[in-house]
Amino acid sequence: SLLEFGMMILEETGKLAVPFYSSYGCYCGWGGKGTPKDATDRCCFVHDCCYGNLPDCTPKPDRYKYKRVNGAIVCEQGTSCENRICECDKAAAICFTKNLNTYSKIYMLYPDFLCKGELKC
């Protein structure tokens, strides 16, 4: 769920999901269109695509369990949907960490109208 994803983001990056990732660029937050603004925004685009590959699941409200083993995120065994949602969230949290050096505050609270066009997953 968004709760676990938010905790993963905080643990990985040291940043709160809200406000740092909740409306960043064109893809972080609800919906998404246009070209990702930077590597962090691309993480969100890929995350959206990952969720899009789970048509039988409801990623935002579905809870799952994960733990950390030697600093690494490990998704715990759950239902098929829980496992796949956790893996999508884990990949995004790791992606955010890898791209912390290019995170730019100019893309926080980025206006949707500046995001034009459609990208295919």
UniProtKB/Swiss-Prot annotation:
Cofactor binding, per record: Binds 1 Ca(2+) ion.
Active site: H47, D89
Necessary cofactors: Ca(2+)
Keywords: Calcium, Disulfide bond, Hydrolase, Lipid degradation, Lipid metabolism, Metal-binding, Secreted, Toxin
Main location: secreted
InterPro entries assigned: PLipase_A2 (IPR001211), PLipase_A2_Asp_AS (IPR033112), PLipase_A2_dom (IPR016090), PLipase_A2_dom_sf (IPR036444), PLipase_A2_His_AS (IPR033113)
Protein name (Swiss-Prot/TrEMBL): Basic phospholipase A2 VRV-PL-V
Organism: Daboia russelii (Russel's viper)
